[in-house]
A protein has these predicted regions:
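Zn2+-dependent metallopeptidase catalytic core
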Residues: 1-30, 34-35, 79-82, 86-89
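Beta/coil-rich, acidic/histidine-enriched accessory regions frequently appended to metallopeptidases
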Residues: 10, 145-150, 174-222
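Sec/Tat-exported extracytoplasmic proteins
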Residues: 11-19, 81-82, 86-94, 116, ...
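Charged, often glycine-rich, active-site loop that binds/positions anionic groups
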Residues: 35-52
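Zinc-dependent metallopeptidase catalytic helix centered on the HExxH motif
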Residues: 52-127, 134, 173
Length: 222
């Protein structure tokens, strides 16, 4: 537990800089010995594991993590948890009343918020690139929404990386901030990209798939 707290203190400033938002909330962390212990605990039994995806969970304002001897995995869980708190503060405010009313008004897709948490917590990697490549070249997805429905965290992480690469990294958090101000993803998208939100999603599918097709053709011709 002490190691997890030290890790959280160490990671917090960099993530606050990234999200451009400080946390006023005290973050409590509960550490389990392994994932099975967490799932079987009273806390774990209250979580719908099938539908909650891979982002670090919170129960009664406590960050729930597990440590199985893999320090990098624990660090990733804690970074995700901190990013989640900071993102919720950014979108919904620190005050509980403000939080509830903003949450009701701002209904963002899960892939978008969880993807942002992944993007903030973990650098893009060759493994993620391989996953994206096989998803986009599989022919299973006619549009972004089908992809995001099937693989929300991967789609969301890749989307924010796409925004950073094509529309400046500074605009990643700004995009979400504008969505909060305007209560609209379309307005935020028009401001950042000069395109409607759906057009940006189509652009993502075309550009990313095209990049992988070119890569494949290049290898065949080599």
């Amino acid at each position: 537990g002490k190691y997890a707290a030290q890790l959280a203190e160490k990671e917090l400033p960099a993530l606050e800089d990234f999200v451009e938002y400080g946390s006023q909330r005290r973050i409590n962390i509960v550490v389990y010995n392994n994932f099975n212990d967490l799932q079987q605990s009273n806390v774990g039994l209250g979580i719908d594991w099938q539908n909650t995806g891979g982002v670090t969970k919170f129960v009664n304002n406590k960050m729930i993590v597990y440590f199985n001897g893999d320090h990098e995995n624990l660090k990733k869980q804690i970074r995700q948890g901190i990013a989640k708190v900071l993102l919720e503060n950014l979108l919904f405010g620190d005050d509980l009343g403000e939080f509830a009313s903003n949450q009701a008004l701002l209904d963002l897709p899960k892939w978008l918020t969880e993807g942002y948490i992944m993007y903030a917590a973990e650098n893009w990697s060759p493994a993620l690139d391989d996953q994206l490549k096989s998803a986009l070249l599989s022919g299973n997805y006619r549009n972004f929404y089908q992809f995001a429905f099937d693989k929300p965290e991967l789609a969301g992480h890749a989307f924010w990386r796409f925004i950073a690469d094509n529309y400046r990294k500074d605009n990643v958090t700004y995009f979400l901030y504008l969505a909060r101000i305007y209560k609209s993803l379309n307005s935020a998208s028009l401001k950042v990209t000069k395109k409607k939100f759906k057009e940006v999603l189509n652009e993502f599918m075309e550009k990313e798939a095209d990049k992988y097709y070119k890569d494949l053709r290049g290898r065949r011709n080599a």
